[in-house]
Amino acid sequence: MEYIFHQGDFYKEILKINNVNEDDLNIDRFFNEQYDEENILLFKEKLLSFKDKKILLVGDYDCDGICATAIIKRLLNHLDIKHSYYIPSRSDGYGLSEMIVKMAKKNNYDVIMALDNGVCANDALDLAKKLDIKVLIIDHHEYKDIPDCEAFIHPNLLKKDYQNLSAGALSYLFSAYFYDDELSLVYGGLSTLSDMVGVLNYNRYLIKRMMDILKSEDIYEINLLNDNKEIDYNSLSFNVIPKINAISRMGYNANVLVKYMLGSKEECINLLPSINKINDYRKKETEREFNIAKSLINENDDFYILISKEFKEGLCGLLANKIVSEYNKPCLVFNESDGLLKGSGRSKEDINLYEYLSNKKDIFKTFGGHNQACGLVLLKEDLNKLLEYINNEKIKTSEYKKDVIDVEIEDIDFVLYEKLLNLMPFGTDLKEPLFRINNFTYSKKIMMAYKYPKYLVNDILSAISFKSKNNKDDFSSVIGYLKKDNYHKNQLSILIEDLS
C-alpha cells in the first residue's frame, strides 16, 4: 500500500500502516500495575519453597538467555538462595539436556531453573523427575504441550499486554515481584531488543524505561560494551548486542558474559578486551563466510540450501539473514561436521518458514524457532528427504507487502527525523517506515570502502546502500529508511533498500 506524506498526519499514518492503536504505545499503565497472574504466583511460591535448596540456573548462550540468567542470579542473590549457573556452549547443544541433568545430580543440586530454554526438553525433564530434581522453567519458545515441571512462566499463559515477551523480559517481570532493581530492568529491555519479540505494550515499557536509565545513569556494564559512546537504539542493536552474541557464535563459552554483566567495573574493564577481540574476529569471519555462501548460490533456485564445513555453526543464522536480505529468498545455512548438518533458516515476512519446515520436522534431530527464523539439526543422510520435500511442496507466500510512504526530497529534514525518534523503538509489530522518493536526483556518487555506493543529495541528505544490487547510476526512485549519518552528525541519510 502507498501513503502520501503529510507532516501533520505522519504519526497517524505510521499507526495505520502497522494496524496499531495509541493504547499499544501507552506505557503509563505499567508503572504501578499490580500483576497477579496465577502461574507467576505459583512460580513465586515454588521458588520460595526451595529457599533452603541448592539451585542450578541453566541459561541459553544468546543475549536473551544471558540477560535472563543475569536477572535471576541477581534475584537469588537478593533472596540469599544458594545457587550457581551454567550456560551450555554450542557444542553442548541448546538448553537443558540429559547431560546437564546428570551433571546437576552429580553436584548435588536439588532444583534446576531453565531460562530461555526447557519448554521442549522432554527427555531431560523425564530424567530430572527420575533423579528427584525439581525443575522450574521460564521460556518463550513455541511448545506443543505444557512441560512437566514444578512451575512454568510463558508469554502464552499471560494476558494480552504481556504476550510476545522475551525470556529476559519474563525474568524481569518475575523478579519485580520481589524487589525493584534498575540493572535487571536494563537487562530485561536489552533482551527484548535482542530477540525481536515486539515493541508494543509491556515490551515498550521495558525498552523505554531501559533507555531512560541508560541516558541518566552510568550503567558501566552497557557503556563499556558501547565504547563509552552515546547510547541509542541503533548502538544497542548494532554494537552492544552483537558483542554479547559474538562469544557463543565464535565457539567460546558464554558463562564469562554472566560474570561480566554482574561484575564490578574493574572486572568488566578487565574482561572487555577479550570480548571486543572476539567480536572483531566475528565480523571478519562473517564477511569471509558470506563470500563463500554467495559462491554456492544458484540464483534460479526459489529456496537456497547452503552447506559447507567452512561455516561456523554460530554464524549460520547471521549468514542466512544476510542472504535473505541480499536475495529476498528463504535460506537454510548448514555447518557440516561428523555426518551432521547443524544450521539456521531465515525468510522474509511473507513466508512462515517455521510452519513450513514443521510439517517435516520428523526428519530433524532438533528443530525450533519462530515464524521467520529457525534452528535445526539433521543427519547428512537425511538431506535428500529435506530436498525432496522442498522440491515437491512449494513454500507458500502470503500477501504481505511492505508499505511505503511517498515523500519529496524537500520533506526530509530534522523535523521529520525527530518525529521518527519519538516513535522509536521500531520492531516486528511497529515497523520502521519505508520512505519512497520519486524523481530522486543527486549531485555526486562516491564509493564507500570501495564497494558501497553513496549518493550525495544536498547539504543535509545523502543515500547509501550496502546491497550490491543497488550499485546503479541510472534510476529515478529510491526506497529506504531514514537514519542519522553516523559520521556527520548534522546530516541525515537514506539507507537504501531498493532503486528503480
Report residues per predicted region.
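Hydrophobic helix-and-loop "lid/oligomerization" segment in the mid-to-C-terminal part
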Residues: 2-111, 130-133, 148, 179-384, ...
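Mid-to-C-terminal polyanion-binding domains and interfaces
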Residues: 48-52, 266-269, 277-307, 358-500
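Acidic, metal-coordinating catalytic cores used for nucleic-acid/nucleotide bond scission
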Residues: 62-65, 92-93, 117-121, 487-488
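Structural signal for conserved beta-strand scaffold positions within catalytic alpha/beta enzyme cores
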Residues: 87, 137, 152-154, 189, ...
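Short, surface-exposed amphipathic charged segments that create phosphate/polyanion-binding patches used
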Residues: 99-102, 167-170, 415-421
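Conserved phosphate-handling catalytic cores of large alpha/beta enzymes
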Residues: 114, 119-128, 135-197, 203-206
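Short, well-ordered strand-loop elements centered on a beta-strand within folded domains, enriched
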Residues: 151-152, 339-347, 489-499
